[in-house]
Amino acid sequence: MERYTEKAKEALILAAEAAEETGSRTVGTEHILVGLMKEGTGTAARVLEAGDVKLERVLELEKKLVSSSQPTQIRDREGYTPIARKVLENSYREAVRFHAPLIGTEHILMAMLKQTDCVAVRLLNTLNINIQRLYIDLLSAMGEEGAAGREELAQGRSG
């Protein structure tokens, strides 16, 4: 956790809590998405909010499609699903690519949006959220160009 910004750490703690509340034994990308949104002040939360991603709708859909009904306790904070772990590993690569000293919420969201087969992206798609627009808005919030973002997202999907 030492590689994360305070906001990213808070989002991951909230993700673990979301997993416990929904009865999941592991933290999935859907829980990380909820954690990013519940953190509320990071770049990822601002971009998601501006992109009309509503926490209530995500929680409702996640409960309907994904969760178990019984709360459980995650034994260790590293109890991520393989895809969630991959997203977190890729968030480190995104931070390095953008020359950031620490992994921020924006890097986690960026890695998540590129992982098109993850539960979080499937939830966003089900909510009719334009993933490409969200990615471009994220790049814009980070001070990058949108046209380059469309190309990067397309490359992320194929590789």
Question: Residue spans of the language-model regions?
Answer:
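Histone-fold recognition with a strong bias for associated Lys/Arg-rich disordered tails
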Residues: M1-G159
